[in-house]
Amino acid sequence: MKSLFPVVFALCMSPVVWAETAISAREVQKAVEQFVLAQVESELPEDARPVVDVRWQGDLAFAADGAPKIRVRRTSSRPLRGPSVMRVGIDVGGQTQRKMSVTADVRIWRPVVVASHMIKRGEEMALVGCELAERDMT
């Protein structure tokens, strides 16, 4: 056992350089946001405005050589509305280095007609008390 210690110590202290690849949290968020917007924009009316809030924190680092590629895919066929889980894979040199689940909160904002005062059941509406405002239609 005593003879094993110098060998392990020498290996740990050897000048081997590990290439470390890092991906920032903002890069992951941006990739998920672009994927979601590409999926959602074709289904929406022209006056709708999608807003995507990606819930991912922390940078990722792993030992690998090459440029990282971020893959994003859906986990279900449900429409992307509200909190939706995405699968994210990070590949370097054709090898998957990391897989994770990321939540994207998708909100659809659209202009709608709203009343400026409370309307009772059966009350007739007039355009005087209404205005056009943008609201969350998710």
What are these regions (language model features)?
Residues 2-5, 16-138:
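Mature, extracytoplasmic segments of signal peptide-bearing proteins
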